[in-house]
């Protein structure tokens, strides 16, 4: 098992399958993982295997390191297409997430005004007013909804604490369309149980929830790197294309990453 722990607070730039040339912003510790999910497919590994000893970067550290990197990229003539909050876990867990978003937008406007600001989140903190308001300010508010099946969520995403999918859907609807839904589709088994969510019994109710949320876009994808759990398999091109086409037929733009 090979997993990735990203530098903090800035990493890359990297080429994102979904976003282009992406400069990563990691609000989590540089030596471990902090997440409200513990997904069996996470490229950063299981939470218990990567407990951090370092603190989260401060708001000031993030701003200083981001400005330093943007100055360097400008001098090199290679500005990013997108500034992406991702990294070792859930970015909205940071206590100063909202303020860091404001700082990032200001630096973006100064150094690379054509770049987008994106946040990749698992949707668990969107009940916090300051998180919701901050996500309304970013260009790409990319929020996870892997399924609407509670058993599947607990089996695959392993949320910490209470996670009620109906409540999450209502909170996603509260963005009034300023949201991109991101969903992982995969096949295979984990601990002797199927984790295949590509079948109609999973896709149909998920699509109904997506219609209710009415996002600006849906991004579906599959496993791209090694996973901490064994026995997982990529969804096929044909499966992803079929799901994508159903979303598009519902009037919602959709991309598939293989």
Each predicted region: which residue ranges?
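Glycine-rich beta-strand-to-loop/alpha-helix junction loops that act as flexible
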Residues: 84-90, 122
């Amino acid at each position: 098992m090979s997993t990735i722990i990203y530098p903090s607070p800035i990493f890359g730039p990297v080429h994102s399958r979904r976003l282009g040339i992406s400069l990563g912003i990691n609000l989590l510790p540089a030596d471990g993982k902090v997440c409200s999910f513990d997904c069996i497919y996470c490229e950063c590994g299981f939470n218990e295997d990567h407990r951090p000893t370092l603190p989260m970067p401060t708001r000031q550290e993030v701003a200083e390191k981001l400005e330093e990197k943007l100055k360097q990229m400008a001098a090199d003539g290679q500005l990013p297409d997108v500034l992406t909050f991702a990294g070792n876990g859930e970015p909205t867990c940071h206590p100063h997430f909202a303020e860091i978003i404001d700082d990032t937008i200001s630096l973006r406007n100064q150094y690379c005004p054509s770049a987008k600001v994106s946040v990749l989140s698992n949707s668990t903190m969107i009940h916090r007013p300051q998180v919701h308001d901050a996500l309304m300010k970013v260009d790409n508010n990319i929020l996870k909804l892997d399924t609407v099946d509670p058993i599947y969520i607990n089996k695959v995403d392993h949320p910490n604490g209470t996670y009620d999918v109906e409540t999450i859907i209502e909170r996603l609807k509260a963005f009034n369309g300023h949201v991109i839904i991101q969903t992982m589709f995969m096949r295979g088994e984990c601990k002797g149980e199927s984790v295949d969510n590509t079948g109609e019994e999973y896709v149909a109710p998920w699509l109904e929830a997506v219609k209710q949320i009415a996002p600006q876009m849906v991004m579906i994808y599959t496993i791209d790197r090694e996973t901490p759990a064994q026995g997982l398999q990529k969804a096929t091109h044909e499966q992803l294309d079929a799901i994508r086409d159903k979303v598009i037929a519902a009037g919602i733009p959709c991309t598939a990453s293989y």
